[in-house]
Amino acid sequence: MTQQNPFQWEHPKALDYNDTIRRRILGYEAIFQLMADLVQVNNENPKNFLIVGAGGGQELSTFIPSFPNAQYVAVDPSDNMLYLAKLRLAEEQLNATIDYYAEELGHVVFPQKFDVATCHLVLHFLQTIEQKKSLIEAIAQNVAPGGMAFFSSINAELDTAST
């Protein structure tokens, strides 16, 4: 019998993501609040957002109260993680126009470019530099001229500490 890797998003442990990520990333909420503040200052009325790695729902939870009339596209290859995003929005009673894609970004074609694109805490899950470069390029190709793209990444192993 093979065991599921707990770092794969279809593993049942992934459902604990929203609880565990805050203990692993100092200032987790601040990353998203600063991003929302930058969007507010630079574009008072963004029409649409592309959220890459949308599982957990943090970006949606942060943006929707400030930009309730915007359209959102949430992309994540994990059904479990998208389920968490939907559950979080229901618990917070946040409503918006959201299209969910349980796909990798490279497998989805959009008819429009986006005013804002985000990719937070995703790149470190990709194995090679080529995969990371490909994802960043795909995001850049989906940002409208004058639009904004936000990235954050972990550059170390989460379960190890260096001294």
What are these regions (language model features)?
Residues 1-16:
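N-terminal, positively charged/glycine-rich alpha-helical extensions of SAM-dependent methyltransferases
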Residues 27-45:
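Conserved alpha-helix/loop element of class I SAM-dependent methyltransferases that forms part
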Residues 48, 147-148:
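Short glycine-centered segments of the SAM/dcSAM-binding site in methyltransferase folds
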Residues 48-52, 56-107:
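Class I SAM-dependent methyltransferase SAM/SAH-binding core
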Residues 118:
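A conserved beta-strand element that flanks and buttresses the S-adenosyl-L-methionine
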Residues 121-125:
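Short catalytic micro-motifs in class I SAM-dependent methyltransferases
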Residues 133-145:
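A short glycine-rich, Lys/Arg-flanked "PGG" loop and its adjoining helix->strand segment in the class I
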Residues 148-163:
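Conserved class I S-adenosyl-L-methionine
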